[in-house]
Amino acid sequence: MANTGVTGRIPLWLIGTVVGSLAIGLLAIFFYGSYVGLGSSL
């Protein structure tokens, strides 16, 4: 637990940014698909 801010050699904030962007992107695609009518296929 000495390196709480760093996981291996990747900064924790970078992981959070990437995961957050992917989550927002997936939610946007899901809502867009539902709005267009293709949400049932996901």
From Swiss-Prot:
Task: Tell me which UniProt keywords the record has, alphabetically.
Answer: Chloroplast, Membrane, Photosynthesis, Photosystem II, Plastid, Reaction center, Thylakoid, Transmembrane, Transmembrane helix
Q: What main location does UniProt list?
A: plastid
Q: What GO CC terms are in its UniProt record?
A: chloroplast thylakoid membrane; photosystem II reaction center
Q: Which SUPFAM superfamilies match?
A: Photosystem II reaction center protein J, PsbJ
Q: Which InterPro entries match?
A: PSII_PsbJ (IPR002682), PSII_PsbJ_sf (IPR037267)
Q: Which residues form a coiled coil?
A: none
Location within or outside the cell: Plastid, Chloroplast thylakoid membrane
Which GO BP terms sit in this record? photosynthesis
Q: How does it sit in the membrane?
A: Single-pass membrane protein
The regions listed as transmembrane in this protein's record are 10-30
How does this chain assemble? PSII is composed of 1 copy each of membrane proteins PsbA, PsbB, PsbC, PsbD, PsbE, PsbF, PsbH, PsbI, PsbJ, PsbK, PsbL, PsbM, PsbT, PsbX, PsbY, PsbZ, Psb30/Ycf12, at least 3 peripheral proteins of the oxygen-evolving complex and a large number of cofactors. It forms dimeric complexes.
Its biological purpose: One of the components of the core complex of photosystem II (PSII). PSII is a light-driven water:plastoquinone oxidoreductase that uses light energy to abstract electrons from H(2)O, generating O(2) and a proton gradient subsequently used for ATP formation. It consists of a core antenna complex that captures photons, and an electron transfer chain that converts photonic excitation into a charge separation.
Q: Which family does it belong to?
A: Belongs to the PsbJ family.
- This one is known as Photosystem II reaction center protein J
Its lineage opens with: Eukaryota, Viridiplantae, Chlorophyta, core chlorophytes, Chlorophyceae
